[in-house]
């Protein structure tokens, strides 16, 4: 009887030791990279919330940041990086939320994307006061064309979604194209898909003797500062909320004149094909 009690006591001690060990074991930290600019970071965090990864506080009209995470059951660490650089650090994190233009350029495929009800139109912008110039109207007409719409739909097959409404033949009847013959329109753009889309508009303008000079930028700041400083006639690289926020923070005078496309944000991983890394 004494031996039975002794064995029972030993078993009880072992159970308690194992229980305390399990309780004390730290849950693995899951690193998720997101874009660092305010609008895209907030957008990424909302996508993670929709996916059940974390829960955000109600921030009202303010953009959510990682400090607004209210519930973090998966022990997620948010890693911020400039939007264009997120694909390059994918190997160093468990997951990354990436804008599809940068993902396409890097040859990446998401395992989940934003819903079809989420739209952040990427826009052609000019400096305030230049909305009605013949250069601007000629540029808008060339982009808001059947040629560009067909290119977006056939090339990206939904990875990039066309937002052009009623399109035309590429020309504006109110523009004096003869006066623009021999002139250059300089526009700043991200490489993919913006510069590729603009290449189609370039051909449309060339038929009227107008050169579209496409300057490619790899970041989210220089296209706006160059436009504000008069080095560019226009830019096309970002969505409306980003441009609104940029104006508010920098006192710039950037206005958007055409919604062209939107890029569904997706979740990517070089290790997992789903959210199994959270388990």
Q: Which residues does each PLM region occupy?
A:
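Bacterial N-terminal signal peptides that target proteins for export
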Residues: 1-11
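C-terminal motif of bacterial Sec signal peptides marking the signal peptidase cleavage site
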Residues: 18-22
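A conserved helix-loop-strand patch within extracytoplasmic ligand-binding domains
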Residues: 27-41, 45-47, 51, 137, ...
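Short, well-ordered beta-strand elements
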Residues: 28-33, 180-192, 210-216
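Ligand-binding clefts/hinges and TM-proximal coupling segments of bilobed small-molecule sensing domains
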Residues: 58-64, 140-178
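Short helix-initiation/N-cap motifs at beta->coil->alpha
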Residues: 60-88, 214-225
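Beta->alpha turn/N-cap motifs
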Residues: 82-83, 91-104, 191-192, 218-220, ...
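Periplasmic-binding protein-like
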Residues: 104-134, 140, 165-173, 257-269
